[in-house]
Amino acid sequence: MTALDTLATALGPHGDLRRDERLARHTTFGIGGPADLFLTVRSSEALAFAASAAYDAAVPALVLGSGSNVLVADAGVRGLVIDNRARTEQADSTGLTFRVESGASFAAFARRMCRLGLDGLSWAVGIPGTLGGAVVYNAGAYGGCLADVLRRVRLQIPGDGGEWVDAADLGLVYRGSAFTRGQLEGKAVLEAEVELAPGDARDLLARAAAHDANRLAAQPRGRNAGSTFKNPPESPAWKLIDAAGMRGMRRGEAAVSEKHCNFFVNEGNASAADVAWLIAEAQRRVGEQFGVTLEPEVQFVGAW
């Protein structure tokens, strides 16, 4: 019996388990090869068990969330991919602090808070992905970021139970954290606690609607992973990519969006290799022409 077989037996009672699941079905890019094991969980306890079981079996594990902000290799992912659908939320006695499981839709939670007249997340209503992913990448837009309202997170510790960690200890920076720098490798976000402020629901919903309208006008609606690159200090990434002559450039069925050059889109049956080529070409051109290094915001996942 292989390590994967042993792990599959252990995971069976804790979620919906599939073998060789094509990850293109589970990413906003619509790109990605198969996962050896693919487990859908619906509670933070099941997520913690799965991550710990994979650790004990020495099988690599990846928490996928909603599949945004990632480019999964055509060869897929070896080991276990956990589809996190843990979405329970609970308010404290003040009604201002919420404990939310990491598989909750970040945008839906933000919009719900606006409707309740709670201020701090109106900027997030159009951001794809889960709350867990928002923690890992310190999601932000329109002058706000999750670090502004995040108090602490509960992490799954390999070979152990959950542990609450203060937000100040997560190394949150622009579109990154200790997770993205590899300093918390192997630790999964189980829950997050956010603290909001009293506000006016009508005003917050108006702000959210304005952000929605801006995104609709400026960003492509097709299959993509969100912003491809972080914005460097010198200039917004889209301006540099545009100036480098890449607006609308294609490779296979992958393309640089005509509407917003920092969005790379899947226009049919694009391969991860074609998207990766466009990313590398943008880095090369911008580096050679402007002396600026573009750092990907999208994460490369799997067997590259």
Show where each model-derived region lies.
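Structural signature of FAD isoalloxazine-binding scaffolds in flavoprotein oxidoreductases
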Residues: 32, 39-44, 71-89, 136-167, ...
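Residues embedded in well-ordered beta-strands within globular domains across many folds
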Residues: 81, 122, 154, 298-299
